[in-house]
UniProtKB/Swiss-Prot annotation:
Source species of the chain: Schizosaccharomyces pombe (strain 972 / ATCC 24843)
One Pfam family per UniProt: Iml2-TPR_39
Cellular component, GO annotation: cytosol; nucleus
Full protein name: Uncharacterized protein C11E3.14
InterPro entries: Iml2/TPR_39
Signal peptide boundaries: none
Entry coiled-coil feature ranges: none
Organism lineage string: Eukaryota, Fungi, Dikarya, Ascomycota, Taphrinomycotina
Amino acid sequence: MFNIKNHLRLPIIGKREPEEQPDPIDHDLHVQRLRELLYGLDLMLDDDAQGVKSAFSDDTVESAVGRSGSAFYNAILGLEPKAIEEATEALYHAEQVTEERKKHFEHHDRPIGSYPAGMELQLCLSDIYLMQSALGFVSDSIVDSMKAAYRIRKTFLSFSKMMEHVRDVQHKKETGEIKSLSPNATFIDEFIESGVITGYGVLTFLVSMFPPSLSRILSLFSFHGVRKESLELLWRASKYPNIQGAIALLCLYAFNAMIQSLGSIPPSNYDQELEHCLQAVKDIRKRYSKGALWAVMEAKIYFLTGESQMALEMEELSIDSSMEQIIAMKGFDTAMLYVGMRKFKQAADAIIELEDLNSWSHAFYRYFAGCCLLQHGKEILGSGGSEEEAKASIDHGIEYLKNAPTLVQKKKKRRTLPVEAYLIRKVQKWEDRAEKLNISIADAMDVPPYAELIYIFVICSLKDPKEAEALRADLETCKCSEEDEAGLKEFLLGVIDRHLKEYDSCRVRMEHVLQLDQGYLSRDNRELWILPFAYYELAALYWDMHGMAAEKEVNHYLKKAQEFNDYDLQNRLSMLAQAATQTLQSEK
């Protein structure tokens, strides 16, 4: 007989229908997926592109996070617009799915370890925010840069809150309040702690490098970065045997080998930090034995510590890497090493090879190669070599120099890089002078352009007295018919004097440079940049002579250097001055 009760559910008066229960969360599966995430990212740092693709091939949240991390890694190494765009899209997708998963954990789960439920996903989300901010700052879009400034504040608040949790939990572990944990809980705790310490360290370090104008605005929101604290956190995080420890070491390398190596006011313990970095890189190469990036880093540090021959031997070795970005990074470092060692033909060859690997700035590659080939030709003549070979090298160099600005003009929907604005001005200045005097571009150059490249990119090579004396010899033979060229020559000789500890001569030269008229230097593509940099070099002079005893004088000259505007290399000086200011604060 048909029974309506079997086919129709009627509500029971006075009783609520039970709520639908969420799907239970499988903690073992969750931990396993996080382990697979770390494993896939380890493969990324070991140059196993196919392994990374396979590890993150499914549609889980963890794979989305892994794919976004891999895309970011590719983008930040090469800074190519297409890679940045792809990484931005991958990060956006990862953000959406991670946010949804995090909310599910927070509302329907219990903690696995010592931290609130879902905090490991909040960490992933904060890492995504941090990567998005970094891409915004290096993109060619002003709008993206503004978005990045807003997003980084959100990231800072997230990491600050998580850092409070980590400090509290680690204190309880030290006092015995939290005792032994299950394997899953131990893994989750280390996942969170290594990630939070690394992320907070990276973030506060980045903020410490912001220019003063932006730092003052951010400080109104209790948003600040102290370099000393951030570096201590990064060294602490670098001990973790996972991707987070590797990222911490990469950041330490970036600071010591890429930022400080460009400046003139290093921390008092800089040499020890480089040695510490070198040992840490050697250790991590045991973990990532196939990762070419770590070999490139090791070679660069050898160069910075004065072991140029060891660096050269490593740079000249071929590397087996599936990542063109790492091969390009190696090529760039090799070119800088060659020019620092006055191997100009090899430097030109190394930098031109990057055109087939990287689209960062073909204009700069041509300009750099042109400067090197010009000097190579001059050295052939100076040593009594073949005039035909010398002329071919000089002509080839001039061709590259003339071609460089046209490559900037061909860029579509991309801002002109500061170094491109610099090279456009230099080439235009030489062409105008050559036309005015009816001479060749090569003859229109009073100061050999490679000398500026050494100051801008390879100033560390001047630590070697032999290299400093060789550059001095080239400069002293220059005959300058233009006042700004004479000022440029005097500036570069002053820099050499400081490196050779001829401090009185350095001060006299820099003060002479500062007597040049700013209005005159601001016109006709002249060398305005030497004025602010002369103040910066005076700060470096007092730092070399007296250290923290001259804090007042160093600060004074750094502030004077930052009073100038609207000149090429302004962004570079801002970065170097901010790094120097943080050095003074860290030494107290």
